[in-house]
A protein has these predicted regions:
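Sec-dependent N-terminal signal peptides
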Residues: 4-14
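Central antiparallel beta-sheet cores of small beta-barrel/beta-sandwich binding domains
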Residues: 18-120
Length: 120
C-alpha cells in the first residue's frame, strides 16, 4: 500500500512540474538596463515539446521555435527582426517561471532576467 501511494504521489508531482501550457505574463530586465520590458507568452505543450508565441503584448507576438520542457526547465527561442531571443527558464512554483534570456543580433549580444506568472 505504501509503495502504491508513493508511486501515485511521484507521478502527480511529475505531471504538475511539467504543466506549463497557458498564458504567462511578466517582464524581462536587460542587464545594465534601468527598466523592465513587458512580456506575454502563450505556451502550448505536447509532451515535452513546446509551441506558442511570445512578445511584448497580445498584439505583437512571435512564434516560438525549438521549444522544449525537461523536468522544471523550459527552453525556447524566437526571432524578432534582426534579434534572436533564447529563453532558459525554470519553474519556480505552479504559477511562476523565472530564468534568463539571451538576446543576439549580428553586432550585439545582451542578457536579461525573466520573471513570469501564469495569467488566470
Amino acid at each position: 500500500m505504501k509503495t502504491t501511494l508513493a508511486i501515485v504521489v511521484l507521478l502527480a508531482v511529475g505531471a504538475l512540474a511539467g504543466d506549463v501550457a497557458g498564458k504567462w505574463s511578466g517582464t524581462f530586465r536587460v542587464s545594465g538596463g534601468d527598466h523592465s520590458i513587458p512580456q506575454i507568452i502563450v505556451l502550448k505543450q505536447d509532451g515535452n515539446r513546446l509551441t506558442g508565441s511570445a512578445g511584448p503584448d497580445a498584439g505583437e507576438q512571435y512564434p516560438i521555435e525549438n521549444g522544449k520542457i525537461e523536468g522544471d526547465r523550459v527552453t525556447f527561442e524566437l526571432t524578432s527582426g534582426e534579434w534572436r531571443f533564447s529563453y532558459d527558464l525554470k519553474r519556480a512554483g505552479a504559477d511562476e517561471i523565472k530564468g534568463n534570456l539571451e538576446l543576439k543580433s549580428v553586432n550585439n549580444r545582451r542578457t536579461a532576467v525573466v520573471s513570469l506568472s501564469r495569467m488566470k
